[in-house]
């Protein structure tokens, strides 16, 4: 509820819907129009966030789900529980960890953390969870449970700014909401994220990335690099 008030105060184009507790969140999920959901940024680490993730992954409306930041850290060392929730659903799940969040989530999972190389770790994690994994960094890897993978090369160092990863997760969620398959949505979001940063240049902040997206979508660069 606190985050809703903050966002409502300065994002006039965003519709907000406050809720309290698990019952309130379940009420939001009951609306089938909410076909894609992002949980994590600013959510806080703990049981309340775990409960929201559980509710989202078991909701009868079965939205596509993106998990980032605090949603992942709330399952630190307990990736098996998350995998069990994901395996019981048909709709896609995408997780978007940076290296620290990845290591916390898969703590104790030697098969994942012991895989040699970032590509192998992302692929092993995707297979273990049954989710698309975006393992962020200057060479962001997108891996699907079926073994497909893409690598975002030459991503600008200007993306290493607070909130940039949250914006990427939002890009993924937006593409999922439009019906794009999960692996393709994740790969496209990584490319768009980098393209926005390249267009903006030095000095960008996270809010700039979303504002730059329409220009990138309308540009010839999108067609040339498709």
Regions found by a protein language model. Give the residues of each.
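Charged C-terminal helix
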Residues: 10, 195-226
């Amino acid at each position: 509820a606190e985050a809703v008030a903050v966002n409502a105060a300065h994002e006039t184009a965003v519709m907000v819907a406050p809720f309290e507790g698990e019952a309130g969140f379940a009420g939001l999920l009951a609306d089938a129009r909410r076909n894609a959901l992002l949980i994590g940024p600013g959510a806080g680490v703990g049981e309340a966030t775990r409960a929201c993730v559980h509710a989202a992954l078991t909701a009868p409306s079965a939205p596509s789900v993106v998990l980032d930041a605090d949603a992942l850290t709330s399952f630190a060392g307990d990736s098996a529980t998350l995998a069990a929730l994901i395996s019981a659903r048909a709709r896609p799940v995408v997780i978007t960890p940076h290296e620290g969040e990845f290591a916390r989530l898969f703590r104790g999972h030697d098969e994942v953390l012991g895989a040699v190389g970032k590509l192998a770790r992302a692929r092993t994690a995707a297979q273990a969870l049954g989710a698309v994994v975006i393992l962020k960094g200057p060479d962001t890897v997108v891996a699907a449970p079926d073994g497909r993978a893409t690598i975002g090369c030459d991503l600008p160092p200007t993306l290493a700014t607070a909130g940039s990863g949250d914006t990427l997760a939002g890009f993924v969620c937006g593409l999922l909401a439009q019906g794009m398959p999960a692996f393709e949505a994740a790969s496209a979001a990584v490319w768009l994220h980098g393209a926005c940063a390249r267009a903006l240049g030095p000095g960008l902040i996270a809010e700039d990335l979303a504002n730059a997206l329409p220009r990138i979508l309308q540009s010839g660069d999108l067609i040339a690099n498709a």
